[in-house]
Amino acid sequence: MKKKLSIAIDGPAAAGKSTVAKIVAAKKSYIYIDTGAMYRAITLAALQHGVDLEDEQALDALLKKTVIELVSTGEGQKVHLDNTDVTEEIRTDRVSNQVSVVAKHRAVREEMVRRQQELGKKGGVVMDGRDIGTHVLPDAEVKIFLLASVEERAKRRFEENQKKGYDVNYDQLIEEIARRDKLDSEREVSPLKKADDAIEIDTTSLSIQEVAGKILDAADRVEKQ
């Protein structure tokens, strides 16, 4: 029987991590864990409760009493915040523009990493985020780091938002993604960083299926070792 692997997929905002991770998880019959959705959920909770996003203690206290669940359904994974489906709401610009602010706090990241490690400890998981290969699953057998230009990522997010009927501005998206890159890369705790043993994939000129194929090939190579 093949050993169930842990697959860590990291990369900057809008690099296609979640889309690719879902495909890889489905092909491998693994559990998909969207860590970004967890940070988005606590960001939404903070906005709903009027918590100052720079107040680390207040955010930590809120997180400790907040239930965030990733629920598998026939329509894909849903995100529940205290038993309420917030799958769509966490993808709005209101949340997207603030999630990096919330995610920079040490106390928030420590609690999230603890929850994520608990979810991933049995293997057979595909987890995507900013610090999966470096902090959450440092022993993952397959580590991937996705790259794409800011312009390409803004284009993808623009098209994604248009399909959902959101009013979006391409130039504004470029600015927001560049700002998130800066926040994610420069934060003190678990910054966005490629793990030393991660395979780097530039997705700029690749389709989602091609990227997923490269990751599945990497997993196959590990399984054959």
Swiss-Prot record:
It is an enzyme of class 2 (transferase). Keywords: ATP-binding, Cytoplasm, Kinase, Nucleotide-binding, Transferase. GO terms for biological process: nucleobase-containing small molecule interconversion; pyrimidine nucleotide metabolic process. Its EC number is 2.7.4.25. GO terms for cellular component: cytosol. It is found in: Cytoplasm. ATP binds at G11, P12, A13, A14, A15, G16, K17, S18, T19. Its main location: cytoplasm. It catalyses: CMP + ATP = CDP + ADP; dCMP + ATP = dCDP + ADP. InterPro entries: Cytidylate_kin, Cytidylate_kinase_dom, P-loop_NTPase. SUPFAM superfamilies: P-loop containing nucleoside triphosphate hydrolases. Pfam families: Cytidylate_kin. The keyword Nucleotide-binding applies. One of its GO terms (molecular function) is dCMP kinase activity. Belongs to the cytidylate kinase family. Type 1 subfamily. NCBIfam families: cmk. This is Cytidylate kinase. The gene is cmk.
